[in-house]
């Protein structure tokens, strides 16, 4: 690539070389945008949530070269969580770790090689779980389940990273209700920093994306979380995405104070 740039520079000059580079970058991202929009049009016609996420996985919907789970699962984007997760495991004496959705297990091996835990990774996409099972060991297992409605495995900590911002309000509360009847002590959740009210929470169809603020309506979590850290995304200029650790009793209290009912998915 560098050799090609030098050839272009010698034959075209600096101005034309820069213009050509910008044009290639623009065309690349325009093509990605076109492909995404075409997939999106078909995706939200699918009524089954499981089939929707199957489609996202099978088509590489997020169009990322390193991870089919999207840029948030790249090693670069997971630098901070790979630093903080071992600290949480040690501080809170975590022995059983439940990771859902686990995605394509791209970054988690970097954590597991340095901690002593029993790990269960889970996702709604069966083909993804089948692929992940090549990584199974005595202390590493994978199971297919729907975190909204299926029984969650007993564990000390559940990681639910980069998930709720893809869920409708109804499905978020379904999951939280399901979490409350589980035998899980702590949960690590993604939320976006919104100190200056840069955005308002909005409802979506599950499988889509929007930023989410768990400390604003309709969730209204209290800011008495146990632990937090910046969960950097390589495409964010500012560090808006954070992860927050809560106990199950905290989640229960939030939901008791702010009961919400959504009759159907979406709006």
Describe every region a protein language model picked out.
Residues 5-155, 167-267:
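Class I (Rossmann-like) S-adenosyl-L-methionine-dependent methyltransferase catalytic domain
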Residues 159:
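A conserved beta-strand element that flanks and buttresses the S-adenosyl-L-methionine
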Residues 163:
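Hydrophobic adenine-recognition pocket in adenosine-nucleotide-binding enzymes
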């Amino acid at each position: 690539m560098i050799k090609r740039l030098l050839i272009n520079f010698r034959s075209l000059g600096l101005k034309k070389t820069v213009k050509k580079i910008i044009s290639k970058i623009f065309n690349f991202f325009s093509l990605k945008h076109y492909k995404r929009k075409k997939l999106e049009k078909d995706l939200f016609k699918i009524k089954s949530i499981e089939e929707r996420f199957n489609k996202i996985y099978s088509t590489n919907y997020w169009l990322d070269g390193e991870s089919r789970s999207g840029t948030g699962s790249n090693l670069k984007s997971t630098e901070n969580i790979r630093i903080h997760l071992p600290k949480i495991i040690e501080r809170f004496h975590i022995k059983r770790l439940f990771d859902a959705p686990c995605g394509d297990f791209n970054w988690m091996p970097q954590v597991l090689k340095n901690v002593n835990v029993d790990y269960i990774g889970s996702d709604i996409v069966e083909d993804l779980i089948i692929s992940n099972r090549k990584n199974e060991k005595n202390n590493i297992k994978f199971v297919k389940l729907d975190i909204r409605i299926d029984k969650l495995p007993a564990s000390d900590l559940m990681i639910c990273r980069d998930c709720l911002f893809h869920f409708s309000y109804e499905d978020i509360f379904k999951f939280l209700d399901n979490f409350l009847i589980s035998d899980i002590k702590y949960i690590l959740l993604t939320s976006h920093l919104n100190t200056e009210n840069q955005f308002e929470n909005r409802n979506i169809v599950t499988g889509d994306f929007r930023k989410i603020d768990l400390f604003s309506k309709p969730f209204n979590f209290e800011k008495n979380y146990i632990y937090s850290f910046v969960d950097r995304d390589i495409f964010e200029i500012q560090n808006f995405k954070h992860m927050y650790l809560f106990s199950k009793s905290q989640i229960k209290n939030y939901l008791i104070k702010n009961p919400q009912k959504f009759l159907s998915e979406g709006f």
